[in-house]
């Protein structure tokens, strides 16, 4: 059987020597070590030897427990899984009984030179047939018709495919006319004529994806009402549908009539028919087509830290975890930042002194891995996490009240997330973090490369007040390479984003090419949101961002020092959210270099507040030599006259070739002597993956998705102007597209007192 995932080959080769050394070391241990074997062609009645292996992982886990319970001393235990696919139908659950010790750890790994896949999916038969008169093919899935099996993901030749949607990926999404007239403002929308067809097949299987500013929601259609051009949802949003924009964005997923692009598919549940539009050159008689059977979770590490029950010294290496579906029914309509209500395919509670190394996580419907309450001293290193329905990693505790009730047992500390390749995230849940560190302290997030995701690559989360900061402190985000983020779906985001943590150190990160939805906020390089306190942001390189390079919103006592920013839409840095309740919103920014491609050094004015921001000793430069730099619309001298940027200069910093994104400094660079800038050229080259060349070059094998097209203000004005239907409005309702001056007493509203040209109502 062919496994096309090139991402795993590096790990198998590199693990050969380590695994064989492990075998040799086991022979010489003072306490006898044990090695068990599992094979897809084994038998669970076998003794688990190399010649007579078990057939399933649960049987091997059971045998490890028996070894631990035996009276004879037991040394390290290694379970080798021979190459092939192991289909799971129930989650595997590890308990404290599966623990090892510091001298006798338990390890589950692929056999040296082979590739073991733990699969929550089922391979579909090759009995595909062409659909008459159509470019797609179809397959009977009787269990879908019987209601026994439904799935929201389809994988063909190792890559996930997209459910039929309108508009197609990359096209401008739809715009709503607004709320349903007289309807629930959280549970319905009014569509523009021609965008929705009430006669579509199986309309109650269609999902409406509302693209809010930073967190989208998914709503199953309850009914389409053509008389009012309304779509009503089964589930209500926690806010009004137009909370972010009057003509908010959305698209429709799982629409049979939208099956018009290669790579799209549709499952007709009532008839039990799966339709798929093959990519050019795909032969369904030979293709490996898999649909997930398992939902949300594949493996659980079920400690109970509140009762002092932990799983310890357990290691997973060189394994592949694939094909778990997202539970779109359970989470329909749920809203929360980062989709942190979602489950993870692998979920750990009370896991300690453990590791996941050189593993692959792919085609998983929600998050990939969660290290939750009570997890400590766990390492995730050199894993390839890609093609995921939501995000890669959830770290820490979600609920602050639960944590505070038993903090000594439940606190999450000392996690290491190092040297992982993470990309193509949010294929279902677009507003997901790449890595999110919730209530967890002393986490090290280093040397990861994260790209091709809709929202924040790395997030640190300790809530919107000061109550949680001590439970998320002392975290380090360093030497990460974060790029091609946003895809123009979302905004108010960043490569590194945090709200609430204390004493975070963010350094030596390379962040570039962010793409924001352009009409609400933007997509920064580093963003310190509310209650971020005592953070140090230094020695980072940020360029090509759709907002500021660096940004603070309602933070306190944070330092931005010795960073480089370049070619940001709105300049080097800004402090937002200053108001009467946030007069302590304070930062210091010094010894930073900013290189513009336009005339904007800083785009907005800085209000003083109780503690004014301290900008000093910065260097500004623009490649647009014919246009002077502006600071909140002012010239540099005026800006400094307001007390800003003392000892700062406008000068060429001495970068070798900034137009080609080479920001390394010459030895005689003016920035060194003018502002005391400390070059970090050698260190920033270390950002991203480390190790052998094949691993470091892995990201270059994957092309990020193209950012989606966006509506221009002219596009939207034309849409609104030419689609006003007063007959769908109530008497007295004022169309949102018009404005009037209350000072002059002017006003307008829909009325039925005077007949309109095309119906009983008009505008008065």
Where are these regions (language model features)?
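N-terminal secretory signal peptides that target proteins for export/translocation
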Residues: 1-13
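Bacterial N-terminal signal peptides
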Residues: 16-28
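Bacterial Sec-dependent signal peptides at the C-terminal "C-region" and cleavage site
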Residues: 27-35
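Extracellular polysaccharide-degrading/modifying enzymes targeting complex plant/algal/animal polysaccharides
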Residues: 37-360, 401-407, 641-651, 661-718
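Bulky hydrophobic/aromatic "packing anchor" residues in well-ordered structure
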Residues: 38, 108, 118, 393, ...
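Short polar catalytic/cofactor-binding loops
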Residues: 40-44, 725-734
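Glycine- and acidic/polar-rich repeat regions and solenoidal domains
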Residues: 91-93, 101, 299, 326-348, ...
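Extracellular glycan-recognition surfaces and repeat-rich motifs
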Residues: 729-763
